[in-house]
Amino acid sequence: MLNTFTIKERGSMGKIYKNEQLSDELIKIKHRGKIYTPDYLVKIILNQGNYVDGNINKKHVIDNSCGDGQFIVHIVDRYVNDFFKHSNNISELKNQLETYIHAIEIDKDEINTCIDRCNKLVSAYGIENVNWDFINGDTLQIDKFNNKMDFVVGNPPYVRVHNLNDNFNSVKNYLFGNGGMTDLYIVFYEIGIKMLNQTGILSYITPSSFFTSVSGTNMRNYLLDNNLIESICDLKHFQAFNATTYTIKLIKIK
């Protein structure tokens, strides 16, 4: 649980939110650099990104590294609850779930788990056989969502470039990845930004290393030159993910 925030201004970097205390919740490291995000952080990230009641209906949202669906399940739940506030048309709700909620995951087992979780959730409302727009594929190679998303949310994979094997060259082809010993999560910022439409919002939880590292230079310059950072929630030295030693920031880009 997020207990207290203090707010400070930091010039063109937007608002800096410093958290003093968060609940201690165990989560697991996921292979391919992903970690499972606890519910309380998912809710904070979605709220920070303004994916909230009254701002959800017929808005495109994607988690481009969805894992087993931790974010997507919350997104579907919010979409369903928001829809029922103005309509009881189950057929139309099914159509909208298929149209406006998107996901990508490279691990087939994980994407299948995500689908199963979402199916179980909506079946409670009498909705069956949803043709989810969830793709089992490599996000680095997918551009069909570019310039279309109202919301991009998630917890990108943390993988150092020297551990990327076959994806090394793909990562280095990205502006944000073409500098120093980069990390895959940095490239996911570039991918996420490209997915946004003109009024879209990106809300990620990631390590804070890009603020000071050589590998984060291109990303920092791009964000500052284009005045993209709306807010940052800095978890400081609190270890939100107990099995890691990263310092974490929640970043909102608009």
Which residues are covered by each model-predicted region?
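S-adenosyl-L-methionine
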Residues: 115-142
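Residues that flank catalytic or metal-binding motifs in active/ligand-binding sites
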Residues: 97, 135, 246
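Signature of N6-adenine DNA methyltransferases within the class I
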Residues: 30-31, 35-44, 65-73, 80, ...
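Class I S-adenosyl-L-methionine
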Residues: 1-96, 102-117, 121, 143, ...
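Short, structurally constrained coil/turn elements
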Residues: 55, 95, 128, 225-228
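Hydrophobic "anchor" residues on beta-strands that sit immediately upstream
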Residues: 59, 101, 134, 151
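Conserved beta-strand segments of alpha/beta enzyme cores
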Residues: 100, 131-133, 228-231
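A general structural motif
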Residues: 56-58, 98, 148-149, 199
